[in-house]
Amino acid sequence: MRAFTTHTGLVAPMDRANVDTDLIIPKQFLKSIKRTGFGPNAFDELRYLDKGEPGQDNSSRPLNPEFPLNHARYQGASVLLARKNFGCGSSREHAPWALEEFGFRAIIAPSFADIFYNNCFKNGLLPIVLDEAVVDSLFAAMYSEEGFQIEIDLQAQTVTSAGQTYTFDVDEFRKHCLLNGFDDISLTLLDAEKIQTYEAQRRQSQPWLFNAVHQ
């Protein structure tokens, strides 16, 4: 998992409340057993005028001209500015996979669905909760200034834009994991030597548990 320390990036809007995980990555793309390949279909039903299917060549599909992420001014955006209850709906982990692969490093919103919020930290995305009034001001600044960027410092827990700095809360353990790029597997591997020692001791004390064939 990619570590997150500081990041300065172009901001793109998702100016609607209650964006659910089916909008983030529609259900027909969940058939894959891999965790990669979802980025091209992030927000598929909003980005395109037709219905997408797995493995389809998106280059020939008609784009929705009204969807902000299709606008030239937001190309290359790495910070998504959203409204309340972002990531609601089903608990599919494919949603943060798709957003991260699309190019986003952080999402700023007044609130997130709990499971989606947790999944973001496990997949290298930083979900930031700011007061709704602050989010409103960021939307206004973004719409008025093409190329609007935000600077995020996870260690300091700050968001800075246009000379204004805002602080956000984050659980210390989640912060530690994201700063160091630790997902569940890499955290476990930190204790690999202890695990191997424990398994060796169990094989000696309880060998019957490890017999391939029980007599």
UniProtKB/Swiss-Prot annotation:
<dbReference type="InterPro" id="IPR033940">
    <property type="entry name" value="IPMI_Swivel"/>
</dbReference>
<dbReference type="GO" id="GO:0003861">
    <property type="term" value="F:3-isopropylmalate dehydratase activity"/>
</dbReference>
<keyword id="KW-0456">Lyase</keyword>
<comment type="similarity">
    <text>Belongs to the LeuD family. LeuD type 1 subfamily.</text>
</comment>
<keyword id="KW-0432">Leucine biosynthesis</keyword>
<keyword id="KW-0100">Branched-chain amino acid biosynthesis</keyword>
<dbReference type="GO" id="GO:0009316">
    <property type="term" value="C:3-isopropylmalate dehydratase complex"/>
</dbReference>
<comment type="pathway">
    <text>Amino-acid biosynthesis; L-leucine biosynthesis; L-leucine from 3-methyl-2-oxobutanoate: step 2/4.</text>
</comment>
<comment type="subunit">
    <text>Heterodimer of LeuC and LeuD.</text>
</comment>
<dbReference type="InterPro" id="IPR004431">
    <property type="entry name" value="3-IsopropMal_deHydase_ssu"/>
</dbReference>
<comment type="function">
    <text>Catalyzes the isomerization between 2-isopropylmalate and 3-isopropylmalate, via the formation of 2-isopropylmaleate.</text>
</comment>
<dbReference type="InterPro" id="IPR000573">
    <property type="entry name" value="AconitaseA/IPMdHydase_ssu_swvl"/>
</dbReference>
<protein>
    <recommendedName>
        <fullName>3-isopropylmalate dehydratase small subunit</fullName>
        <ecNumber>4.2.1.33</ecNumber>
    </recommendedName>
</protein>
<dbReference type="Pfam" id="PF00694">
    <property type="entry name" value="Aconitase_C"/>
</dbReference>
<dbReference type="GO" id="GO:0009098">
    <property type="term" value="P:L-leucine biosynthetic process"/>
</dbReference>
<keyword id="KW-0028">Amino-acid biosynthesis</keyword>
<dbReference type="InterPro" id="IPR015928">
    <property type="entry name" value="Aconitase/3IPM_dehydase_swvl"/>
</dbReference>
<dbReference type="InterPro" id="IPR050075">
    <property type="entry name" value="LeuD"/>
</dbReference>
